[in-house]
UniProtKB/Swiss-Prot annotation:
NCBIfam families given in the database record: Hfq, PRK00395.1
Region named Disordered: 63-102
Low complexity composition bias: residue spans: 70-96
Keywords: RNA-binding, Stress response
Subunit structure: Homohexamer.
Organism: Cronobacter sakazakii (strain ATCC BAA-894)
InterPro entries: Hfq, LSM_dom_sf, Sm
Residue ranges of domain Sm in the record: 9-68
Name the UniProt record assigns to this protein: RNA-binding protein Hfq
Amino acid sequence: MAKGQSLQDPFLNALRRERVPVSIYLVNGIKLQGQIESFDQFVILLKNTVSQMVYKHAISTVVPSRPVSHHSNNAGGGSNNYHHSNNAQPSSAASQDSEDAE
C-alpha cells in the first residue's frame, strides 16, 4: 500500500506544512473547509473553528485554495499531475475522440 500513497502523502503534507486552506468534499456531497492539521493512513484532521477527524474512505475530493508544489524524489515522474493547465486539454480531447468512434 505504500506505493499507492506515494502521491497522496506528499500532497497532503505540503498542504499541512504550508497551511493551505482546503475544501474537502465527502462522497455524500458535504463540503468541509479548513486547514489540514495532520493525517495518517486512515484519517485527516481538519481544523477550522473546531478540529474534525475525517475518515479518508469518506472523502471524494481535496481541493486546495491555491496551487501547491508537492514534488517527490523521482525525476520526471508523475509528481506534476496537479497542475491544471497541462491536464485540461488532453482529457477533453480524449473524451471527444471516444464520442467520434461511436
